[in-house]
């Protein structure tokens, strides 16, 4: 019984990073919303916060009003930046930020870490989990700053 509860607890505190990358790379608002809900239901961790923040920033571009977009973007940015602050050398979190910074409107002024993040992602690429490495390889094909 204890083993079953432990397994359920572990399952409830994890998520598929491949699913998150699929939602981020797509244009479907409903898949982003579903992933946000799924991550919000999980217990908090640096990974959960970093990915939730990234999803929220991506979702912000699909909202209707500028006020809604900015509020969602700021909420997501705070979550991701908190994770990066707690683990500044984490190339996975830096990759998440790089994807956002390369694609957000310049008016948001969230583009000051692109070169630094690209360098850290390139140097830390081999130590990333396979699902994250796959996302990095896919993203690098269209990124003006990331080369492997």
Locate predicted features.
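Terminal, low-structured helical/coil segments at or just beyond the last alpha-helical repeat
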Residues: 114-148
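Short coil turns that delineate tetratricopeptide repeat
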Residues: 43-44, 88, 126
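Bacterial Sec-dependent N-terminal signal peptides
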Residues: 1-19
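Conserved structural position within tetratricopeptide repeats
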Residues: 40-41, 84-85, 123
